[in-house]
Regions:
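Hydrophobic, regular-secondary-structure patches
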Residues: 27, 31-117, 135-136, 226
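Extracytoplasmic
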Residues: 51-55, 75, 91-96, 111-116, ...
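A conserved hydrophobic position in a structured secondary element of the catalytic/binding core
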Residues: 59-60, 72, 121, 147, ...
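Flexible glycine-/small-residue-rich
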Residues: 60-62, 100, 120-122, 172, ...
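Mechanotransmission and gating elements of multispan inner-membrane complexes involved in transport
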Residues: 84-88, 107-113, 151, 159-161, ...
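Short beta-strand boundary microenvironments
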Residues: 114-158
Length: 235
C-alpha cells in the first residue's frame, strides 16, 4: 500500500510542466518576500539614522507629509531660540538650523540629470544634523555645493560626474562641487547642500522650509509645541 506522501510524489512526476510552473511561482513569492523585507529594514535603518530624539523640526501646518511644500517666515529661527529655553547655545551660537528644502532638476556636465533634492543650509546645520560629516573637500562658499555620497545614485549619474571640482546645474545656475559628505546612512546622503542665501536667491524665495532645533538633554519639546500653538501657521 502506498503512503499518502507517495501519491504526491507520483503526481509530481506525472505532470512535470504543472509542477515546474508551481515551483517557479513559489520561488517568485519567496523572492518577493525577501525583497520587501529587505526594503523595509533598509528604510527603517535610514529613518533611524536620520532621526535624533533631541532634534525638533518646525514647519508649516499641513506639510508633514511633504516638507517641500512647507513655507515659514525667515525670522522663525530667531523667534524660536528667544522663546524656547531648552535650546542649546554654545560660544554665542544657537543650535537652530534654518533650511530651505526642495526637489529640483539637477544636471551634471555629461548627463541629462534627474530630479535631485537640494537643501539650503547655514553653518549651524552640522551642529544640529550631527550625523553629517564632511569626508572630502570643503564646506560650500558662494556658488558652491557639497554632495552626499549617494547623490549620484539619486540622480542616475556616475560618481565621477559629481567629483570635487566638477560642476552641476540647477535652478538656472551653474554650481561648483566643493566637497562630499556622509551621514551614517541617513537620508541626507542623497541630497545636495548649498548655502541658504544662495538657494533663496536662485529660487526667488525669502522664506524657509523648516527649522531644525537641537534641544538640551532633559529638555522637553513641549515648549516648542506651545510656541507653535501660539502661531497657527506652524507645526
Amino acid at each position: 500500500m502506498l503512503l499518502p506522501w507517495e501519491y504526491g510524489v507520483r503526481n509530481l512526476a506525472r505532470r512535470p510542466v504543472r509542477t515546474a510552473l508551481t515551483m517557479m511561482a513559489l520561488a517568485t513569492v519567496v523572492m518577493l518576500v525577501f525583497v520587501v523585507v529587505g526594503f523595509i529594514r533598509g528604510l527603517e535603518q535610514s529613518l533611524t539614522a536620520s532621526g535624533d530624539q533631541n532634534v525638533v523640526l518646525v514647519y508649516s501646518v499641513n506639510s508633514e507629509e511633504n516638507i517641500e511644500n512647507s513655507s515659514i517666515p525667515a525670522r522663525t529661527p530667531s523667534l524660536l531660540t528667544a522663546s524656547v529655553d531648552g535650546t542649546i547655545k554654545r560660544f554665542g551660537l544657537n543650535h537652530a538650523s534654518p533650511e530651505l528644502y526642495a526637489g529640483t532638476r539637477v544636471k551634471s556636465e555629461n548627463n541629462e540629470g534627474g530630479l535631485g533634492l537640494v537643501r539650503g543650509v547655514t553653518l549651524a546645520a552640522p551642529l544640529v544634523r550631527r550625523s553629517v560629516q564632511l569626508v572630502d573637500g570643503a564646506w560650500p562658499s558662494d556658488g558652491e555645493v557639497m554632495v552626499g555620497r549617494l547623490a549620484a545614485a539619486k540622480l542616475g549619474s556616475r560618481e565621477d560626474e559629481l567629483a570635487i571640482g566638477k560642476s552641476i546645474e540647477f535652478e538656472g545656475r551653474s554650481w561648483n562641487i566643493s566637497g562630499r559628505f556622509a551621514a551614517g546612512g541617513a537620508a541626507y546622503e542623497s541630497e545636495i547642500w548649498c548655502r541658504l542665501s544662495d538657494f533663496q536667491t536662485v529660487s526667488k524665495r525669502q522664506d524657509i522650509s523648516l527649522v531644525a532645533l537641537l534641544l538640551a538633554p532633559g529638555s522637553s519639546p513641549a515648549e516648542v509645541e506651545l510656541f507653535c500653538k501660539e502661531r497657527t501657521d506652524l507645526e
